[in-house]
Amino acid sequence: MVGVVVFTQGPSVVTVHVTGFKKFHGVAENPTEKIVGNLKSFVEKKGLPKNLVLGSCTVLETAGQGALGTLYKVLESAIAERENGSSAQGQIHFGVNSGATRFALENQAVNEATFRCPDELGWKPQRVPIVPSDGAISRTRETTLPVNELTKSLRKTGYDMHFVASLLEALAVLN
């Protein structure tokens, strides 16, 4: 599944960097690993709108601390590209929720790690900041994309989607 955003104002070219996770406890084959791993070849075959460029496609370890080094490299590369004036940069992360039956688009991320089972490196945090230097667990980051409208648009094209404000809201709905 690829969602396409058409920009009517702003930069003429946007480069999007995509991340997803490898397998994790209880899920031997993570669908996001397949999506991210196959995205470049899919885009080569199907193409993208002229104002959208696929940057990096990176599959991260499903480990809180184990993923940070690779994630920082992806983000630093995007920042360097932006500072060189090559294009505007965007980040899409495909997470996974083993209890979900459909895709969810989220408009915010929370700086909190609370795992119900240990990650792939054995870490099982409870209400701990993912990135301590980014603030407390109440710290959020919100996208400027019109996520609710994107969800509606994807539903109209046949994708079984729903909108949630954050992963925490999605987990609350499932529990």
Q: Language model features by range: what are they?
A:
Residues 2-170:
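N-terminal catalytic or cofactor-binding beta/alpha core of small enzyme domains
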Residues 171-175:
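Active-site-adjacent mobile loop/cap segments within catalytic or ligand-binding domains
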